[in-house]
Regions:
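Core segments of transmembrane alpha-helices
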Residues: 702-706, 774-783
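Conserved cytosolic headpiece of P-type ATPases
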Residues: 1-756, 761-764, 821, 838-911
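Alpha-helix capping/termination and helix-coil
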Residues: 630, 682, 686, 781-793, ...
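Membrane-water interface at loop-to-transmembrane-helix junctions
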Residues: 759-777, 807-819
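Generic alpha-helical transmembrane segments
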Residues: 734, 815-832
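Helix-coil boundary and interhelical linker segments in multi-pass alpha-helical membrane proteins
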Residues: 714-723, 789-815
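Alpha-helical transmembrane segments and their membrane-interface junctions
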Residues: 778-793, 864-875
Length: 911
């Protein structure tokens, strides 16, 4: 792989020319359904169809009243109002769904912004995938997604998963024509956009970008996966069906009750019934019943969920959480266990060589000062260390800013290159001058890597360089000449690991022409151990607080790391996970973990805090064991080998700098790799669930009131207490507007003080049910009492109720019906604020960050006043103007809903 440095790559001018000629590396999305078709799709909704039927019935009744009864043109205001309500409901629903679609499309954009390592003007640098052009030289390594079509220049044991294009899960790629697979779909030296590197590394020269790639010719846009039915979505489907059936039953009851009441006026003597009037009455009754069904059915629930998800996904992206699968938003809020990597997630992933211990002919070098001296001399021992670090590596440095070089590739290997660079050793020159004979890439199972080269610093020598986990590398060594006994090396390692430093061991051997790398292992008999470097990776400043927040929220955190037990324990101690009370039962090594039977693991799994020296499949087995304990598991991963665990977990969390294979297997990508962002994802998941509960609380409370009021009105034999257009306005408030207001509520950090919810628990819990029945019942009793008073007394202004005298039945006047309608709306207007404060200890008037709620509530209030007071609007809703005193009494009286809740909350908080 070292021969890569003979390539210069494109200049800036050549990049511009190539982009102008061949275009950018972005796939054109497939054509979408035209907006007008998407809008018309809304009219296929069963509830909209019911409303359209109600509108047609209203038109028929209005025509009868206008022609048959010679009434004025104002009879057409109601059908016009119905159709306006229909278009308003469909229009708002269409608008917010298109907005949500735009939010979900962010996945494609982020995918195009992923970093790619290229060589330009002789320098290694990182660019966005969208900026790759034809002619670019791109470095590809294990786990990465190939950014464009290209031809291999150099390849080391390269295997590519082409299943997305050819169905072949593993294709071996090479630049050696003698090894070409002549039966392969594509030439063995050609790699294709969208396929993934499963093993090895290579350099490729781009030959096609964007739509010109093979992938571009069969491209289907990546989408947010919303196909998974979560417990919440299943509950909401069942709830919607149950409410729909109940609403239809109430609708039938209203029809029967109104017909019976109508015929009772004529002692059920059909001869006395005016047929046309009776038909008109039945049509009106059917219209009221259908409207009641529309009002009762929670058709706003899907929109509330969609809006909540879209809003949450957009805001989560701002906190470095890219949601790839929609169900993960909800599931993250129910997480009970987080299995996390150490490097980069708990630590800063800013590695630097802090200590070194090299062994030269019995001379111990146990300080970084001594190690620096060795690097600067010209002995063979020094040359072995310098050359071994420089050539036995897949990392590079971006030296475009010499004052602040940055690492490209593995951060641990990069720390070694930075160490050489800081001491004036030109690692690039060393790579240029050697001839690489063969390589053995690093794997998590092997835990070491090896490279055979024709040495540049020691001419005439062929050298094998090995680097990896010190204990593994030491055990490979046959020569102990000048090297302390293993016990002494282990003691040195333990000192480093107790300081939470990552260690690497080095070895080398001069060899002949024989092949020493066979079947993925090295076969030598005189490998000599050179020494150890200790690399520091400080804990992220915010992690201890975030770990504490998770523990306080009832979430267990488990560290799964490839580091040693001592290193892992020290990191655990620094982040607040490992305490003095913990014992050997709380930590286990990868081999010990693998040796456990399932029964033994099930008995131990909840106590395990750290798995050290973990192997890839250990993480997946840990996830499965936790799931057997009914835990909701989130797991982090950044490598290709993490994909099985990411898929097995309830929520897979890939890292922003992880491989494409890991990202594709995950549900959420943590862009900044930080554990704090994982903690934020939990908070967003819990808040999303709470917002949906708030919407249900508000809507079902309004449902109970509206349904019972209309049914009771029918049984009392009165005129319908609410007209069709009034019910549609109420429906608009509690469905569309409430969905908009409550779905956009910001997350509350207070949710992190609660224990995780039971993922299978029904979303309507006991406190919600009690409030729905209690508040809905209170509103119903209040409105029925008012309806009874209006039916048996002549109310000229609202203050008359204080001294009212109940008399015989009388017709409810338009003024009284307007009072009833306005009181209904205003009580629920104030209850909207109560719903916002549900399950919190905050005041309902704590509106910081609730811009959407404030805007929507203001809109509801202003619109209600306008429809009652503006002459042009009154006719649509069959209302009349109210007196200023009436408004004052209604507003003050209705607000008692709010103040009673505030008083109760105050008393509860004091207790």
């Amino acid at each position: 792989m070292n021969s890569q440095h003979h390539f210069i790559g494109l200049s800036e001018q050549q990049v511009a020319d190539s982009r102008a000629k061949y275009g950018i590396n972005v796939l054109t999305p497939p054509p979408t359904t035209p907006l007008w078709k998407q809008f018309l799709e809304k009219f296929r909704d069963p509830l909209i169809i019911i409303l359209l039927i109600a509108g047609v019935l209203s038109v028929a009744i209005s025509i009868y009243e206008y022609i048959g009864l010679h009434q004025g043109a104002e009879v057409f205001f109601e059908p016009v109002g119905i159709f306006v309500a229909i278009f308003l409901a469909t229009g708002l629903s269409f608008y917010f769904e298109t907005q949500a679609d735009k939010e979900f499309c962010v996945l494609n954009q982020v995918n195009d912004d992923e970093s790619v390592e290229v060589i330009r003007s002789g320098n290694h640098t990182q660019i966005a995938k969208r900026d790759v052009v034809v002619g670019d030289i791109v470095r590809i390594g294990i786990g990465c997604e190939i950014p464009a079509d290209g031809e291999l220049l150099v390849a080391t044991q390269l295997s590519v998963d082409e299943s997305t294009l050819t169905g072949e899960p593993l294709c071996h790629k090479t630049t050696d024509p003698a090894l070409f697979d002549l039966k392969a779909t594509y030439p063995s030296n050609r790699v294709l956009r969208g396929t993934k590197v499963m093993e090895g590394h290579a350099l490729m020269q781009v030959t096609a970008v964007g739509d010109a790639t093979e992938n571009g010719k069969v491209y289907k846009a990546a989408q947010i996966d919303n196909s998974v039915k979560t417990p919440l979505s299943e509950q909401l489907d069942w709830l919607g069906l149950w409410v729909s059936r109940l609403s239809c039953s109430i609708g039938v009851a209203v029809v029967v009750a109104r017909i019976v009441m109508y015929l009772a006026q004529y002692d059920f003597c059909f001869a006395n019934v005016d047929t046309l009037a009776f038909i008109a009455y039945i049509l009106q009754t059917l219209m009221i019943a259908m409207t009641l069904v529309v009002v009762s059915v929670p058709e706003g629930l899907p929109m509330a969920v969609t809006l909540s998800l879209a809003y949450s996904m957009r805001r989560m992206l701002k906190t470095n959480n890219l949601v790839r699968k929609m169900h993960a938003c909800e599931t993250m809020g129910a997480t009970t266990v987080i299995c996390t990597d150490k490097t980069g997630t708990l630590t800063q992933n800013r590695m630097s060589v802090e200590e070194a211990c090299f062994y030269r002919g019995g001379e111990d070098c146990k300080s970084i000062v001594d190690a620096n001296k060795i690097l600067l001399d010209s002995s063979d021992f020094s040359n072995e260390i310098k050359e071994g670090i420089a050539v036995n590596s897949t990392a590079s440095l971006d030296l475009s800013n010499p004052a602040a070089p940055s690492v490209l590739g593995n951060p641990t290997e990069g720390a070694l290159l930075l160490w050489l660079h800081a001491k004036g050793v030109d690692y690039e020159a060393l790579r240029e001058e050697v001839k690489v004979v063969e390589e053995l890439p690093f794997t998590t199972d092997r835990k070491y890597m090896a490279t055979v080269v024709e040495s540049a610093l020691m001419p005439g020598k062929r050298m094998l360089y090995v680097k990896g986990a010190p204990e593994i590398v030491y055990d490979l060594c046959a020569s102990t000449d000048g090297v302390p006994l293993k016990a002494a090396v282990d003691a040195q390692l333990k000192l480093y690991q107790q300081r939470a430093m990552r260690t690497l061991g080095f070895a080398c051997q001069e060899i002949g022409d024989e092949k020493v790398i066979v079947d993925g292992t090295i076969h030598v008999d005189k490998l000599r151990f050179l020494g150890i470097t200790a690399i520091a990776d400080p804990v992220r400043n915010e992690v201890p607080e975030s770990i504490g927040e998770c523990l306080n929220a009832g979430i267990c955190v488990k560290i799964v790391t490839g580091d040693t037990a001592e290193t892992a324990k020290e990191i655990g101690r620094q982040v607040g996970l490992w305490t003095d009370k913990d014992t050997d039962r709380n930590i286990i090594s990868g081999p010990e973990f693998a040796a456990l039977t399932d029964a033994q693991l099930d008995a131990l799994v909840m106590d395990i805090k750290i798995i050290a020296r973990a192997r890839p499949m250990d993480k997946k087995r840990l996830v499965e064991a936790l799931q057997r304990k009914n835990q909701v598991v989130a797991v982090t991963g950044d490598g290709t080998n993490d994909a099985p665990a990411l898929k097995a977990a309830h929520v897979g969390l890939s890292m922003g700098d992880g491989t494409s294979v890991a990202k594709e297997a995950s549900d959420i990508t943590i862009i900044d790799n930080s554990f704090k962002s994982i903690c934020k994802a939990v908070m967003w998941g819990r808040s999303l669930y709470l917002n949906i509960q708030r919407f249900l609380l508000f809507q079902l409370t309004v449902n109970v009131t509206a349904c019972m009021l209309v049914l009771c009105g029918a049984l009392m034999g009165t005129e319908a207490p609410l007209t069709v257009t009034q019910m549609l306005w109420i429906n608009l408030i509690m469905d569309t507007f409430a969905a908009m207001a409550l779905a956009s509520l910001p997350p509350s950090e207070a949710v992190m003080n609660d224990r995780p919810r039971d993922r299978r628990a029904f979303i309507i819990n006991r406190p919600m049910l009690a409030e729905i029945v209690g508040v809905g019942g209170f509103f119903f009793a209040l409105l029925v009492a008012l309806l009874y008073i209006f039916e048996h007394a002549d109310i000229q202004q609202l203050t008359d109720i204080v001294r009212v005298q109940i008399g015989e039945n009388s017709t409810v006047t338009p003024y009284e019906l307007t009072l009833l309608f306005t009181i209904f709306v205003m009580t629920h207007f104030f209850y909207l604020f109560n719903a916002r404060a549900f399950a919190t200890h905050r005041s309902a008037l704590h509106l910081k960050g609730c811009k959407g709620l404030v805007f929507i509530s203001t809109l509801i209030f202003v619109t209600q006043v306008c429809m009652v007071e503006l002459p042009g609007v009154q006719r649509f809703f069959n209302v009349v103007s109210l007196k200023p005193l009436d408004w004052l009494i209604i507003i003050v009286g209705s607000s008692f809903v709010l103040w009673m809740r505030e008083l109760w909350s105050l008393l509860r908080n004091k207790k």
